[in-house]
Amino acid sequence: MVGFRAGDVPPTATVKFIGAGTAACIADLFTFPLDTAKVRLQIQGESKIPVNTGHGPVKYRGVFGTISTMVRVEGPRSLYSGLVAGLQRQMSFASVRIGLYDSVKQFYTKGSEHVGIGSRLMAGCTTGAMAVALAQPTDVVKVRFQAQNSAGANKRYHGTMDAYRTIAKEEGFRGLWKGTGPNITRNAIVNCTELVTYDLIKDALLKSSLMTDDLPCHFTSAFGAGFCTTVIASPVDVVKTRYMNSAPGQYCSALNCAVAMLTKEGPKAFYKGFMPSFLRLGSWNVVMFVTYEQLKRAMMAARHNWATPL
């Protein structure tokens, strides 16, 4: 378009909010099987209900071993168990934690052009906590579905709405917000690491003129952010998954869950599912951030075309 480049016009808060939720849903569609494999590996060793596969208590071995076992035993659809709740989660969760990040960052810097790492970290913590408070029930349902053996006769839930109703009925209103504490901790860490690392890598690449503000820069920044996030957030993520999936009374708190893991399974338990976590977060970050950047530009271009008379 002559005289107009979408990248030259800062996207509005609404564009960021809608774009973040949409991009996160697209990323989830591509990477959901890896997330399901991660959940299965993380809860392995704590389940009180043995799965009848004929191979003893250890069912899953590695990322692709987990995926192939699930497909063989439960069918291909099992890899997308909980997808509906996952998409509900991203539309409410990512829209807040990613879409509002720049606005909250500007609030902390009071509009200053210089943005220090402290302001970035505070913005990441704030939007991460806000997103969890809003979207926690969708995360609980998603994890329960992913952990559930689709081939078993005794399914805990038979649909997304059934899961919301059953949890509220059997565990009370608080059951839908189970694990909010560890999830806020996890997402404060994830948000700070993911968004701040993406911010810093992208700024460094642009300031050093190694790359321009385009797809290769977005890809590199997103991949680096995914790796850093996985390394830092994995222990909290494992505790969060175990605690949210636990039966009522199994753990009295998230801390009790962490202590039980350390006592029974050792320190390595906190990095169970690390490879699928990295594959998922790395690929999720790449798809989400690249899509998000392109969506922002496309939406700003469409907005300009709509506002400009022919």
UniProtKB/Swiss-Prot annotation:
Q: What superkingdom heads the lineage?
A: Eukaryota
Q: Where in the cell is it found?
A: Mitochondrion inner membrane
Gene Ontology cellular-component terms for this entry are: mitochondrial inner membrane
Renumbered to this chain, region (Purine nucleotide binding) spans: 277-299
List UniProt keywords, sorted A-Z.
Answer: Membrane, Mitochondrion, Mitochondrion inner membrane, Repeat, Transmembrane, Transmembrane helix, Transport
Instruction: Identify the InterPro entries for this entry.
Output: Mit_carrier, Mito_Metabolite_Transporter, Mitochondrial_sb/sol_carrier, Mt_carrier_dom_sf
Which loops or segments lie on the Mitochondrial matrix side of the membrane, by the record? Answer: 33-78, 138-181, 236-269
Q: What catalytic reaction does the record list?
A: L-aspartate(out) + phosphate(in) + H(+)(in) = L-aspartate(in) + phosphate(out) + H(+)(out); oxaloacetate(out) + phosphate(in) + H(+)(in) = oxaloacetate(in) + phosphate(out) + H(+)(out); (S)-malate(out) + phosphate(in) + H(+)(in) = (S)-malate(in) + phosphate(out) + H(+)(out); malonate(out) + phosphate(in) + H(+)(in) = malonate(in) + phosphate(out) + H(+)(out)
Residues assigned to the Mitochondrial intermembrane compartment are 1-10, 102-120, 199-215, 293-310
Family statement drawn from the similarity comment of this UniProt entry:
Belongs to the mitochondrial carrier (TC 2.A.29) family.
- Protein name as it appears in the record: Dicarboxylate carrier UCP2
Tell me which species this is from.
Cyprinus carpio (Common carp)
